[in-house]
């Protein structure tokens, strides 16, 4: 008779308590599926996926978006993951995936609510808030369409342009600017995960 698998009771109610890794793969918890106008996010206090916002008509999420459990990014949330897969998943779905890189960026918020005190010299200290907001890029383990994608360089240049355009418009909806800092490889992505794990443990 086979032994029963050990389960973490907390993870059954809170997916953010699942392990971020399964062997050599990361475990991505989907929040918002590809093609969706609704932005969903996991509410840690209430233990449920909640609607955060609705994108304007004609604007949808270009890929499945989720997070890695037991991590903490610079923006105060678990580290974000953009997941490449054949068809959209659903909120709360656990998907094993392999990292291929990271999209590094920062969001810029004008705390004064206008341009007067923006980046001009002599403006009030703290008038502009910059926050790193990186997104890991991963490929689902179960995929046909993206099976040959092993690194970011395997993706067409148009993919990056469309991704950058989406985030510029997405952050603009909240009155924030988005600056793309660049793309880095799978090793850099893994380093980001380890740093986010360390931050979560020390919280």
Feature map (PLM): residue ranges:
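Hydrophobic N-terminal alpha-helices or hydrophobic patches in metabolic proteins across all domains
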Residues: 2-203
């Amino acid at each position: 008779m086979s032994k029963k698998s050990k389960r973490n009771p907390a993870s059954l109610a809170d997916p953010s308590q699942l392990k971020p890794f399964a062997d050599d793969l990361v475990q991505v918890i989907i929040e918002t599926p590809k093609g969706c106008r609704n932005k969903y996010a996991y509410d840690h206090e209430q233990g449920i996926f909640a609607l955060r916002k609705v994108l304007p008509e004609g604007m949808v999420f270009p890929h499945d978006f989720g997070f890695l459990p037991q991590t903490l990014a610079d923006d105060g949330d678990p580290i974000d993951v953009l997941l490449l897969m054949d068809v959209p998943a659903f909120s709360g779905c656990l998907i094993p995936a392999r990292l291929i890189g990271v999209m590094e960026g920062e969001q810029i918020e004008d705390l004064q609510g206008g341009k007067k005190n923006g980046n001009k010299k002599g403006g009030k200290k703290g008038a502009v808030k910059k926050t790193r907001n990186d997104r890991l890029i991963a490929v689902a383990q179960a995929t046909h369409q993206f099976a040959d994608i092993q690194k970011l360089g395997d993706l067409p240049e148009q993919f990056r342009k469309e991704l950058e355009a989406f985030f510029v418009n997405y952050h603009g909806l909240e009155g924030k600017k988005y600056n793309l800092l660049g793309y880095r490889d799978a090793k850099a992505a893994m380093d980001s995960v380890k740093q986010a794990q360390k931050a979560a443990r020390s919280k």
